[in-house]
A protein has these predicted regions:
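Short, solvent-exposed amphipathic alpha-helical segments in soluble enzyme
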Residues: 37, 126-128, 185-190, 212-213, ...
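A contiguous, basic/glycine-rich beta-loop/short-helix subdomain that forms a polymer-engagement track
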Residues: 207-263
Length: 279
């Protein structure tokens, strides 16, 4: 099959001689963005087309002026640019994540963006699209990546918290997607205690709740306003933080913390932190 209307350029995936790009890494006139992670969603484009959730995530991360113009495109809403018919389909990756489905010259090409086929209670599930060409991300495509059952891992975390009431658990999570999925799965598995958040996680969690994802009782993981010594207050508590904070002095303020990572990848032997939750 000859395809001459889409190609890879230094900016990213270029469609119809630059009429628009998908997830470009350099500023362009018109960009369709699959989701809000920084390696796909960059500031500086003139016109950004994405789901409302992705646009709000970009606004939260980059400020109101992250682009000159933005257009909300709902899932399965039709859009035509230079004779290319376009719609977005759920990708199951994070809130608002989408596949870009393009139809031109009797050819259907789907750009997956990052996607996930496992259940995730915080975003719309991945939707298979019949395509002539499927341009896929392959972050975890190698056979070495074997993910255990997510609910099993969540219950192991809950059991660990219950087994060590004199210690706190500090789990490293990425601020967009991983944090909210972990929290929601904990709630769905019966853990309704307050979860304490590093400051860098708060805004995106609030944004998820704005879009109807109930994350339960969340509080900042501060030490200044606690009624008792932080060492005593945080015993038996669960704290979520970005991975970088686990090796920082920030995590040492807590009582003999058990450190872990909520990761989509495997635990390699050279890692110093255990992967408690592979979700």
């Amino acid at each position: 099959m000859k395809v001459d209307w889409i190609k890879k350029t230094k900016e990213g995936i270029q469609v119809k001689d630059g009429s628009f790009f998908v997830d470009p890494i350099y500023p362009v006139k018109k960009a369709i963005i699959t989701h809000g992670h920084a390696d796909h969603a960059r500031a500086g484009h003139e016109h950004v087309i994405a789901t409302l959730e992705t646009l709000e995530i970009m606004k939260e991360r980059y400020g109101n002026n992250f682009c000159k113009k933005s257009t909300v495109l709902k899932y399965h809403e039709k859009l035509t640019i230079e004779e290319v018919k376009i719609f977005l389909a759920p990708a199951g990756h994070v809130l608002g994540s989408a596949q870009v489905v393009m139809n031109f010259a009797n050819q259907v090409i789907t750009v997956s963006g990052d996607y996930k086929r496992q259940d995730d209670p915080t975003c719309a599930a991945f939707e298979p699209i019949k395509s002539d060409i499927f341009i896929t991300e392959a972050t975890f495509a190698l056979p070495v990546f074997k993910h255990p059952n997510a609910n099993t891992q969540i219950n192991l975390l809950i059991k660990s918290i219950q087994n060590f009431p004199e210690r706190c658990h500090v789990i490293g999570v990425y601020s967009l997607g991983k944090a909210q999925r972990l929290i929601k799965m904990l709630r769905n598995n019966g853990w309704h205690n307050t979860i304490y958040l590093h400051g860098s996680l708060v805004k995106i969690c609030n944004l998820y709740e704005k879009f109807g994802i109930d994350l339960g009782d969340l509080e900042p993981a501060t030490i200044q306003d606690k009624p008792e010594k932080p060492h005593d207050f945080y015993k038996g508590k669960l704290i979520l933080a970005p991975p970088s904070a686990l090796a920082d002095r920030w995590s040492r303020r807590f009582p003999d913390p058990i450190l872990g990572m909520a990761s989509g990848s495997v635990s390699y032997t050279h890692l110093t932190l255990p992967t408690i939750c592979s979700v």
